[in-house]
Amino acid sequence: MPVVVDKFLTVTEHDNDKDTGIEVRNGDWIDISASGRIWAGVWFTSENGPNGWTGWAAGEDKPLPGAPPFSLIGKMADGEYFYIGAGLRRTYQNATLGPGATRLYLTVNDDKHGNGTGAFTVRIQVWR
């Protein structure tokens, strides 16, 4: 399988569903890795990496309840949010997509984007 995408981008604490510009198809192999630090805007807390507040589970007010708050998460235009953290490798499968493509979006698992600082540097590779 050849690499069809190898892209670096920045996801800030302010970004809400940042469009990566990447189209993903059924059967694509996706590798996402992230580094960097954000401060979520919660007083008396420190910065965190893309894994978010490990040991905590986000409440229903966050985009991905149950995942670590303030972690890096993603979604496809046709689906639900999924946890990425510092890295994710998987084959994309969607039974209803057929031969078409869907767009990849990234964000922080935060209900109040814009009240903190910092960013994650993300590398996305897609093999087809």
Place the predicted regions along the sequence by residue.
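Gly-Asp-aromatic-enriched flexible segments
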Residues: 1-128
